[in-house]
Amino acid sequence: MDSLYDISCFAAGLAGNIFALALFLSPVTTFKRILKAKSTERFDGLPYLFSLLNCLICLWYGLPWVADGRLLVATVNGIGAVFQLAYICLFIFYADSRKTRMKIIGLLVLVVCGFALVSHASVFFFDQPLRQQFVGAVSMASLISMFASPLAVMGVVIRSESVEFMPFYLSLSTFLMSASFALYGLLLRDFFIYFPNGLGLILGAMQLALYAYYSRKWRGQDSSAPLLLA
């Protein structure tokens, strides 16, 4: 019979997977619009490329030969990588110009090369426990940059006193996912998991606080902004 500790770890990691799925699904509304218009319009494909790189690096960290016992980190980021790649393919297909299409393809190649460099370096130049520390440090830096990216949007909310560009459910999903994985990391005593997700938890709470304050003032129309914020 599994111990209470094992059950708690699994429950926290599973909750993080579920809340992360809500984040991965958040751009669906944007891509429904792209499919309907058969054009990417003014939407930016860069956030999906950064998210793909982040998912690939964190997926690598969760694999047994890098960090044993982190399978739920691998599953959530494997699913995330599939979603981001699908979004990027749609973006390439519906790009308004050949220049934009080639730019996204070129950046996608760089993302793949960057991930290949990290994964190969971790295998050929590092043994345990240095391998886990190397990949963990890279994944932590990537996660922190992803969690910090909405700071610009928070600034827009404060200046405009409008939550139009900061969807509530996206902020809530970020908060809940970060809380779940912060707990998961604490239970595993894994600094590379609980520290960046702890920061994500704080930033998610700040977004929710801003939403609670400014949503009372906001009387705008539906947003045309992409739901994956950068």
Curated annotation (Swiss-Prot):
Bilayer-crossing regions: 7-27, 46-66, 73-93, 104-124, 138-158, 168-188, 191-211
Membrane topology: Multi-pass membrane protein
Cellular component annotations (GO), alphabetically ordered: membrane; plasma membrane
Domain of life: Eukaryota
Residues exposed to the Cytoplasmic side: 28-45, 94-103, 159-167, 212-230
Record keywords, A-Z: Cell membrane, Membrane, Repeat, Sugar transport, Transmembrane, Transmembrane helix, Transport
Gene Ontology MF annotations: identical protein binding; sugar transmembrane transporter activity
Extracellular side stretches: 1-6, 67-72, 125-137, 189-190
UniProt-annotated location(s): Cell membrane
MtN3/slv domain: residues covered: 13-98, 133-217
Pfam family, one: MtN3_slv
GO biological-process terms attached to the record: carbohydrate transport
Function: Mediates both low-affinity uptake and efflux of sugar across the plasma membrane.
Record-stated family: Belongs to the SWEET sugar transporter family.
Oligomer and partners: Forms homooligomers and/or heterooligomers.
Protein name: Bidirectional sugar transporter SWEET2b
Gene behind this protein: SWEET2B
